[in-house]
Design a protein with these regions (language model features):
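PP2C/PPM family metal-dependent serine/threonine protein phosphatase catalytic domain
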Residues: 64-81, 120, 165-166
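Acidic loop->beta-strand submotif enriched in PP2C/PPM serine/threonine phosphatases
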Residues: 73-91, 127
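Extreme N-terminus nucleophile/cap motif
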Residues: 1-59, 66, 150-166
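Short beta-strand scaffold segments in enzyme catalytic cores
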Residues: 2-6, 28-36, 68, 84-86, ...
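Short, glycine-/Ser/Thr-/acidic-enriched flexible segments
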Residues: 10-11, 72-74, 98-99, 141
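Short histidine
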Residues: 100-153
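Short, basic and Ser/Thr-rich N-terminal targeting/leader segments
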Residues: 25-28, 61, 79, 128-130
């Protein structure tokens, strides 16, 4: 199971938590943040490189709204094109869970199929219903949970699950 993290400006998961998330979900990851002017993104098939990027840019990222994702591949190869978050006109989106309605489609990844269907529907959120957790960072840095019930990890930090803590 993957994990999604949203962190408001001034909040960030503890470094040990980020490391545990990456180790439990080792098939890639990414972080998207708003730098005050536009959205930025860093993704890599090695989740530890994502953790390293976050650590090396800690001062900047801690004070920006961030959407972080660590992937456990269930559908689709461990490959750069399957690392979340995915870019849309609405911002960057990340998914946690299996999108059962989208296991078959043009992509190996159920998430990529779901995101494509969401875009093609004109961003009708009913497409996302029942497909797991989905979070978005908008082009102006607003963090939104579109589906699922996030868990408060600590002040200002929400996660899609805590399975990585086991």
């Amino acid at each position: 199971m993957c994990v999604i993290v949203t962190a408001v400006p001034g909040a960030m998961p503890e470094p040990a938590d980020l490391l545990a998330m990456s180790e439990a979900n080792p098939d890639g990851g990414g972080v998207s943040w708003w730098d005050g002017k536009r959205l930025r993104v860093f993704k890599n098939v090695d989740g530890l490189k994502v953790v390293g990027y976050i650590y090396s840019h800690w001062d900047r990222l801690k004070y920006a709204p961030c959407l972080i994702h660590f992937r456990l591949a269930t559908h689709g190869a461990v490959a750069p094109e399957n690392c979340h978050p995915f870019r849309t006109e609405r911002g960057y989106v990340a998914h946690n869970g299996i999108a059962y309605d989208f296991e078959d489609g043009p992509y190996e990844s159920d998430t990529k199929n779901m995101v494509r269907a969401w875009i093609d529907s004109g961003y009708d959120n009913r497409i996302l219903s029942g497909q797991g957790s989905v979070a978005l960072i908008t082009p102006h840095g607003c963090l939104k949970w579109l589906e699922g019930e996030p868990v408060l990890l600590e002040r200002g930090v929400m996660v899609s699950n805590t399975y990585w803590q086991l």
